[in-house]
Amino acid sequence: MSQVFKDFDLSSVWEANSWADENYKEAPFTPEILAAVESELGYKLPQSFIELMAVQNGGIFVKNCFPTTQRNSWAKDHVQICEVSGIGFEKEGSLCGAMGQKLWLEEWEYPPIGVYFANDPSGGHAMFALDYRECGKDGEPKVVFVEQESDFEIVELAPDFETFIRSLRHEDEFSDE
């Protein structure tokens, strides 16, 4: 039995949103689709990411802000996560969709550090990524924030994806300043 997300309700993570469903939420993935996505990406996705996507395969989080002391173009005390890419090929915003990993690496020239899995409200000018630089392509990646407007500065947010998800806060907890 998995020890990932012990005592945590994964169904509470996702917000109902028809636009995100249409563009980011993939159908449930099979082991074959997961293997094909990991092969195309060149990285083994962390078990915590896989388990969250098994509940809902992409979309928008209810708690969509991560506290940080690193100022960014969005806010001084947090970063906001928007759409989260599902595991698949069909939806435009899925990991291997038209607006997925290849777009961020090849057209936007984001650094090849791992898997870009979500954006912020800037529409692609800042991304959330699973950073495999220290752990290798099969290891447990950190979660980082990469901001294009700051010369692709990489800011570590969490030591792993589960910690990242557990640390998310609702946007109402932050001021608009």
What are these regions (language model features)?
Residues H125-G136:
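Low-complexity, glycine/alanine/valine/leucine- and proline-rich hydrophobic stretches
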Residues G123-M127, S150-L157:
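Short, surface-exposed beta-strand/loop "edge" segments at domain boundaries and coil↔beta transitions
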Residues G136-D138, F152-E153:
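A short local loop/turn or secondary-structure capping micro-motif enriched for an aromatic residue
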Residues N119-P121, E134, E147-S150:
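Short, flexible loop/turn elements at secondary-structure junctions
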Residues M1-G123, D172, D176:
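A surface-exposed partner-binding patch
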Residues D138, S167-S175:
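N-terminal processing/targeting junctions
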Residues V144-E147, I154-H170:
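Compact, glycine/acidic-enriched structural inserts
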